[in-house]
Amino acid sequence: MKQMSPTAYVILGMVKKEPRTGYEIKALVDNSTRFFWAASYGQIYPELKRLAEAGLVVGSDSSTGGRRRTVYEITADGEEELQAWLRQPPQTFEMRDEGLLKLFFADALPREEALEIVRKMRAQRLAMHDRLRAIEATKGDVEESFPMVVLRGGLEFTEWFADWCGRMEEEILAAAPEKRST
């Protein structure tokens, strides 16, 4: 198989834990890696097909309530591929945040509109923090330590970012008043 996408490795990691359908993989992604690596159905199903063709997963038909579905399981080659990828150094971190991009160019807006960008970013981070707290509450005594490490990192990051937005709002408000043309 040629160069694999990070989404392919998300799928391998999810089916390493236990066999799953594409639908189950998507549901799991939505409550775990989505906060730092999202995957849509439009990515998951084509990747499952490529992984199966490469012999990294194997699908078996299963019926539930008259509905046909395919359950995917990782193969020995798939486990080797996943472990090889995990051992590689991570790609250089590249943050992409449209809110920060807009804030970077916010001098082009009246101050109140620029402040609204900061307020919306803060509200988004607080909402994400609440969602992560809800996920944390459902985990109980999770045996997997590294997903919990990442969850705690997400909680700390969203809390820090929301606090930063609050401080930036205060600084912008405290700055010299906006000059108005007469």
Q: What positions do the PLM features span?
A:
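Basic helix-turn-helix/winged-helix DNA-binding cores
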Residues: 1-94
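Long amphipathic alpha-helical coiled-coil segments
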Residues: 173-182
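Amphipathic alpha-helical dimerization/coiled-coil segments
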Residues: 83-131
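Amphipathic alpha-helical coiled-coil segments
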Residues: 158-171
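Acidic interhelical loop/turn segments
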Residues: 133-151
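Residue-level recognition of alpha-helical structural elements
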Residues: 40, 110, 114, 143-147
